[in-house]
Amino acid sequence: MGGTFDPIHQGHLVAASEVADRFGLDEVIFVPTGQPWQKADEPVSPAEDRYLMTVIATASNPRFQVSRVDIDRGGPTYTIHTLRDLRAEYGAKVQLFFITGADALAKILSWKDLDEVFELAHFIGVTRPGFRLSDAHLPADTVSLVQVPAMAISSTDCRARVSRGEPLWYLVPDGVVQYIAKRRLYQK
């Protein structure tokens, strides 16, 4: 599951759990982006903070793992590089699924090396409340759209709540709330 995870929240975790169950996945690997190219003009928390929040959030689920592949590579993060690295690590016999939000999937036609991206993994677009995605332009054999239990939580809203001094309890895992407070993330 790729994402900025700034911060990771319960919606990410529910989506990963639902997809793992529906597709019979042995594990879900969370891959926090290093330098997200789509957000080059937006402030993004340091990669190490986003990685550690993801580790904290996923620690209690034995099916969840966290990879540093994008963070350790350096430079802008492109999905093609992530998939090539994961393919090299896991081998050709392992089927890769790339879980992402439907909002990100809507922009997939602008992604680098798109044809190879679809050769390396099956994409699962998780729908969010209030977001509709037409899959007419997406290759049906390599893309699935999945509805998960509605959780109207976004990382953008979580950051805004912290900057306004509002609580994050139950929107993100408890350990992530504590990490954000300790590191003073998202405060003005």
From Swiss-Prot:
Pathway(s) annotated for this protein in UniProt: Cofactor biosynthesis; NAD(+) biosynthesis; deamido-NAD(+) from nicotinate D-ribonucleotide: step 1/1
E.C. code: 2.7.7.18
Record keywords, A-Z: ATP-binding, NAD, Nucleotide-binding, Nucleotidyltransferase, Pyridine nucleotide biosynthesis, Transferase
Reactions catalysed according to its record: nicotinate beta-D-ribonucleotide + ATP + H(+) = deamido-NAD(+) + diphosphate
Gene Ontology MF terms in the entry: ATP binding; nicotinate-nucleotide adenylyltransferase activity
Superkingdom classification of source: Bacteria
Pfam families membership: CTP_transf_like
Transmembrane segments: none
InterPro entries the record matches: Cyt_trans-like, NadD/NMNAT, Rossmann-like_a/b/a_fold
Top class in the EC scheme: transferase
GO biological process terms on file: NAD biosynthetic process
Family according to the record: Belongs to the NadD family.
Function: Catalyzes the reversible adenylation of nicotinate mononucleotide (NaMN) to nicotinic acid adenine dinucleotide (NaAD).
HAMAP family xrefs: NaMN_adenylyltr
Protein name: Probable nicotinate-nucleotide adenylyltransferase
Organism of derivation: Salinispora arenicola (strain CNS-205)
Source taxonomy: Bacteria, Bacillati, Actinomycetota, Actinomycetes, Micromonosporales
Name of encoding gene: nadD
